[in-house]
Amino acid sequence: MTASLHIILDTDPGIDDAAAIAAALFAPQLDLQLITTVAGNVSVEKTTRNALQLLHFWDADVPLAQGAATPLLRPLRDAAYVHGESGMEGYDFVDHQRQPLAKPAFIAIRDVLMNAPEPMTLVAIGPLTNIALLLMHYPECACNIRRLVLMGGSAGRGNFTPNAEFNIAVDPEAAALVFRSGLEIVMCGLDVTNQAMLSPDFLNKLPALNRTGKMLHSLFNHYRSGSMRTGVRMHDLCAIAWLVRPELFTLQSCFVAVETQGEYTAGTTVVDIEGRLGQPANAQVALALDVDGFRQWVAEVFAYAP
């Protein structure tokens, strides 16, 4: 199968990010042109190191650029309590000499977009700081973005505060700018990612699959978004799944606003499912997932990896 969709992946590895990067690299329908890192699950130095380790593990020839070290206006609040102090606890990666590009992520994204023969798809599975910086410094790049597919937000409960999902809550100002930008946005939030559970039976079969399965199984043993006994949530993998298997998702066009001011609600995505605010839709919001189909696709795409 010939890869038909050229993508840029903005990420903050992160254990579930590792699974998403594997899918982005090895799904035959995708052509991963650039990886950019951002502070989120852990510091940007650690997310960059983790992404480089993964690229070396797979001997993947994909350029990588390091991005923002802090949110636009706030100090970083990370998720090391979920992913471990390094961000990818549980597997000993071998040493390597790989280095990121000598330019920041938002400039690297600009360069790839402006040199592409047609608009490209951005996939953001961390805080939206790099995407906001791109739009702030190079608004003309918006014409070269086919769509933005993101993992973030929620139409209901949060996982970082009572109402806010982690990726949006880390940098609400960046997220607010992105949702106001006019980009075509597909939002894969907690409404679907909490359904995206890999069962214990699925997880136990990973080591026999290939060396990627062994590595991911080791990481998942240290992942605190679920457990090996009850299943683990593959939040970030949903964004990649939508690119390849959109029919697995139920989407609704909605107006989405990001709260930036509330003492208790900053980072909340206000998803106007019923149209009460009278604002035009600015996102396609994923609200339901075919879980069995998702698991089948994950098994297929992991099998493509070495």
From Swiss-Prot:
Pfam families: IU_nuc_hydro (PF01156). The active site is at residue 235. One of its GO terms (biological process) is purine nucleoside catabolic process. The keyword Chloroplast does not apply. Its EC number is 3.2.-.-. GO terms for molecular function: purine nucleosidase activity. It comes from the Bacteria. One of its GO terms (cellular component) is cytosol. Keywords: Glycosidase, Hydrolase. It is an enzyme of class 3 (hydrolase). The keyword Hydrolase applies. Belongs to the IUNH family. RihC subfamily. Hydrolyzes both purine and pyrimidine ribonucleosides with a broad-substrate specificity. This is Non-specific ribonucleoside hydrolase RihC.
